[in-house]
């Protein structure tokens, strides 16, 4: 029916069930009773823990019908699918650039405002998004949740793991438009292009 009779006394948000209200309360208390057995990271909800655990298992049950790329959660697949359809329903009021998700738009808008509302408790460095702060905090914690299946080397970021894996695969996806020489990393291509 769409009825949401349970209201949070902290922020006024209304939810449809008492259970959802209890889960929501954890966003205010910071309580994280669900813990990953692999890395010890805590979560406020069990479904968030299950999504996180796919980082360790490598499980990607949701597959894009266009390109065959696998995803650990259905929502990420739906967002990815927009790269094929070109759908960008969220538009920046400053520069008219379009985005496929509201979150991407919000992240982009911090470029215009220069806003960095999130601060690292360890070093006071400011960040525009929770995701960027979370990645940065691994510098302090030493957490490396992304592991190479070939050599077991750990990485703090997934993109760093993907770059590393080209050592094993021999893949060189970055090609020089001038001479067709291939490189495993974008930075190496940029250094090479100075020659031309």
Curated annotation (Swiss-Prot):
Record bears the keyword NADP: no
Classification via Gene3D superfamilies: Classic Zinc Finger
Keywords recorded for this protein, A-Z: DNA-binding, Metal-binding, Nucleus, Repeat, Zinc, Zinc-finger
Any matching Pfam family: zf-C2H2
UniProt GO BP: regulation of transcription by RNA polymerase II
Family listed: Belongs to the krueppel C2H2-type zinc-finger protein family.
Protein name: Gastrula zinc finger protein xLCGF3.1
Lineage, uppermost ranks: Eukaryota, Metazoa, Chordata, Craniata, Vertebrata
């Amino acid at each position: 029916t769409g009825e949401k009779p349970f209201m949070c006394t902290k922020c006024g948000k209304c939810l449809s069930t008492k259970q959802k209200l209890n889960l929501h309360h954890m966003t205010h208390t910071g309580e994280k009773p669900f813990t990953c057995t692999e890395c010890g990271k805590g979560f406020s909800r069990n479904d968030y823990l299950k999504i996180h655990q796919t980082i360790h298992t490598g499980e990607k049950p949701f597959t894009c019908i266009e390109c065959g790329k696998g995803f650990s959660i259905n929502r990420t697949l739906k967002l990815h699918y927009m790269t094929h359809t070109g759908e960008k329903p969220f538009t920046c009021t400053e520069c008219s650039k379009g985005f496929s998700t509201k979150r991407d738009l919000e992240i982009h808008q911090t470029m215009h405002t220069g806003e960095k509302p999130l601060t690292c408790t360890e070093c006071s460095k400011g960040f525009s998004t929770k995701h960027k702060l979370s990645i940065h905090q691994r510098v302090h914690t030493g957490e490396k949740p992304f592991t190479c299946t070939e050599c077991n080397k750990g990485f703090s970021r997934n993109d760093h793991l993907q770059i590393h894996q080209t050592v094993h695969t021999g893949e060189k996806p970055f090609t020089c438009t001038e001479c067709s020489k291939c490189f495993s990393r974008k930075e190496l291509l940029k250094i090479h292009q100075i020659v031309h």
